[in-house]
Amino acid sequence: MAQGVHKITEDFEKSLCDYTGAPYAIALDNMSNALFLALYYENYVVGRIETDTITIPSKTYPSVPCEIIHAGLKVNFEKVEGNTIKGAYQLKPTRVWDSALSFTSNMYIPNTHMCVSFTGPYKTLKLSKGGAILTDDYEAMLWFKRARFSGRRETSYHDDYFDMIGWNFYMMPELAARGLLMMTQFYNIDGTPKHNEDLELPYPDLS
C-alpha cells in the first residue's frame, strides 16, 4: 500500500479502475511515457514481442513512433485514409494500445496494456498533463509502479532498498488529487457510470 503523498495517487488509480473496468491502473506524468514503459516491459522485461517492427496508423500523435524507437523497436506505418483517426488502436502485434482518444466506462480490453491520456485541451479527462496504463497483468503492474518512480517503492527512500533501475515518470500528487475530484463528472446522479464517445482528431501523416 502506498504511503504519505503517494496515497492520493493510489486513490486516483482506484477510481480509474472502477470506471474503466481495468483491474490495475498506473498513473504517469504523460501518456507518451506510458507507451514507452508498456513497450519496454513487453520487449525487454518479459520478451513477449517476437518482431522488431511495430505497426501503427500513419496519422497519429508524433510521440508514438518516438516511443516505439526509444523502446528498441522499429516503426511500420499503416496507411490511413482521410485526415483523422478515432478512438483506440493497437500497436500491432503487441498487447499495447494507444487509447489517447478513448476514455469511457468499462473500456478495458482484457490481456492488454491500454495507455490513456489526460494531457491537452481535447482529452475527455482534462488534467493539463498526465496519463495512465490500464492492465490486468499483476506482475506488469508491480514493474510499472517501480519503473515510473526511479525504481523505488512507494515509500521514503530512507526505508527503501534499491535493486532496480527506473525513470522519473510518476504523476505529481496534486494532479492525482485533481483527477480524483474530476472523475465524479463521469457518473450520473444515481451513481451509474456515463458513456463517453471516442474522440476523433486530425493528425499529420508521419509516414
Residue positions per predicted region:
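Conserved SAM-binding loop
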Residues: 27, 56, 133
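Alpha-helix N-cap/helix-start capping motif
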Residues: 6, 29-32, 58, 138
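PLP-dependent aminotransferase-like
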Residues: 40-107
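Alpha-helical elements of the RecA-like P-loop NTPase motor core of helicases
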Residues: 36-37, 65-66, 142, 177
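Phosphate-binding glycine-rich loop
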Residues: 10-53, 67-71
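A glycine-/small-polar-enriched, mobile loop at the entrance of the PLP active site in fold-type I
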Residues: 1-10, 184-187
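Active-site region of PLP-dependent enzymes
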Residues: 103-105, 109, 113-207
